[in-house]
Curated annotation (Swiss-Prot):
MF annotations from Gene Ontology: tryptophan synthase activity
Enzyme class: lyase
SUPFAM superfamilies, alphabetized: Tryptophan synthase beta subunit-like PLP-dependent enzymes (SSF53686)
Function: The beta subunit is responsible for the synthesis of L-tryptophan from indole and L-serine.
EC annotation from Swiss-Prot or TrEMBL: 4.2.1.20
Cofactor: pyridoxal 5'-phosphate
Keywords: Amino-acid biosynthesis, Aromatic amino acid biosynthesis, Lyase, Pyridoxal phosphate, Tryptophan biosynthesis
Name assigned to this protein: Tryptophan synthase beta chain
Self-association and partners: Tetramer of two alpha and two beta chains.
InterPro entries: Trp_synth_b_CS (IPR006653), Trp_synth_beta (IPR006654), Trp_synth_beta/beta-like (IPR023026), TrpB-like_PALP (IPR001926), TrpB-like_PALP_sf (IPR036052)
Length: 396
């Protein structure tokens, strides 16, 4: 695999573990990506869409009430304000433009929470590309507002009835479709995972999150934060936040995986800290798997974090100790979801609530510590209000 233009590995993680038929397709994608990155016209069009269609830059908001009684300053990077309601829109615009540049006439994608599906549907509507979204049947049920949004924007949503009917099954179906239709079709992967060049490409199309955050925090506080905190499922919002801070050794990078019903129950989605390295979804990375290599079911209250693996760059950052990965339970995330709504008037996505919950935990552990924290508020919580309502009002 040494004949790729970019390094397909992060340390031992990553690579291109796909059927032989897809190797030239991935290499063609890598070539197109490298050419686009070096093309001022492509960059100008991407930047214009981010600004005038998606609404970048997004705000960096100081929490006025959540930190009362402590010496912490807590800022939120407001990806929830982006068109589409989450950070997903950033890289989807990049990939959709790239697909168009490559002459692809059809887009496919997988989605869990439905946010990536919505972002793909809106980009395809705007760029006039037909799109098919694969979504686990279980997720179609728990994310009905997003399913309606996708269909409203002209996407075909296919509920996947196989396996656990969740995100991992949607990924497998999308990969199958791509292997059959790669000549006309671009598979628009929704996270910084999968075979090379996807993890690198998605990071590059998301890294403005951290770049903007750095500029904004220096403007407001005249210094870098002590830590940036982001939720980790596949890992795209987190790598988008971390990328520009990796070289800033004074800034702690904290990724928050879902502990679900508690790590000890086995019902979680924390492969980085509680999985083993294996091959899945076209890459070598930590996976939740049985001793004989069967992929285990991941679980999280948040559909977008319910993924049994993680992007290879996070695995690498964890292995060298540059980033710290922790986990937060459903209950802790729900508490943070309510706290932000009640005290700041912002309803966060359940995914983002995991990152917020860990920040609140840090503050509670040491209220007298003067610290500057930034949480990546990766998406808004409209899609989750029915789930939360069910739980708070005595449902399951």
């Amino acid at each position: 695999m040494s004949d790729t233009l970019l390094n397909p590995y992060f340390g031992e993680f990553g690579g291109m573990y796909v059927p032989e038929i897809l190797v030239p397709v991935l290499k063609q994608l890598e070539e197109a990506f490298v050419a686009a990155q070096n093309d001022p016209l492509f960059q100008a069009e991407f930047t214009d869409l981010l600004k005038n269609y998606a609404g970048r830059p997004t705000a960096l908001t100081l929490c006025r009430n959540l930190t009362k009684g402590s010496k912490t300053k807590l800022y939120l990077k407001r990806e929830d304000l982006l068109h589409g309601g989450a950070h997903k829109t950033n890289q989807v615009l990049g990939q959709a433009l790239l697909a168009k540049r490559m002459g692809k006439t059809r887009i496919i994608a997988e989605t869990g929470a439905g946010q990536h599906g919505v972002a793909t549907a809106l980009a395809c509507a705007m760029l006039d590309l037909p799109c098919v979204i694969y979504m686990g049947a279980k997720d179609v049920e728990r994310q009905s507002p997003n399913v309606f949004r996708m269909r409203l924007m002209g996407a075909e949503v296919i509920p996947v009835q196989k396996g656990s009917c969740s995100l991992k099954d949607a990924c497998c179906e999308a990969m199958r479709d791509w292997a059959a239709n790669y000549e006309t079709t671009h598979y628009l992967i929704g996270t910084a995972a999968g075979p090379h060049p996807f993890p690198t490409m998605v990071r590059e199309f998301q890294k403005m999150i951290g770049e903007e955050t750095k500029r904004q925090i220096l403007e407001k506080e005249n210094r870098l934060p002590d830590a940036v905190i982001a939720a980790v499922g596949g890992g795209s919002n987190a790598i988008g936040m971390f990328a520009d801070f990796i070289e800033e050794k004074s800034v702690q990078l904290i990724g928050v995986e879902p502990a679900g019903k508690g790590i000890e129950t086995g019902e979680h989605g924390a492969p980085l800290k509680h999985g083993t390295t294996g091959i899945y979804f076209g890459m070598k990375s930590p996976i939740m798997q049985t001793k004989d290599g069967q992929i285990e079911e991941s679980y999280s209250i948040s559909a977008g974090l319910d993924f049994p693996s993680v992007g290879p760059q996070h695995a690498y950052l964890n292995s060298i100790g540059r980033a710290e990965y922790v986990s937060i339970t459903d209950q802790e995330a729900l508490d943070a979801f309510q706290a932000l709504a009640q005290h700041e008037g912002i309803i966060p996505a359940l995914e983002s609530s995991h990152a917020l919950a860990y920040a609140l935990k840090l503050i509670a552990q040491n209220p007298d510590k003067e610290q500057l924290l930034v949480v990546n508020l990766s998406g808004r919580g409209d899609k989750d209000i029915f789930t939360v309502d069910k739980i708070l009002n005595g449902g399951n």
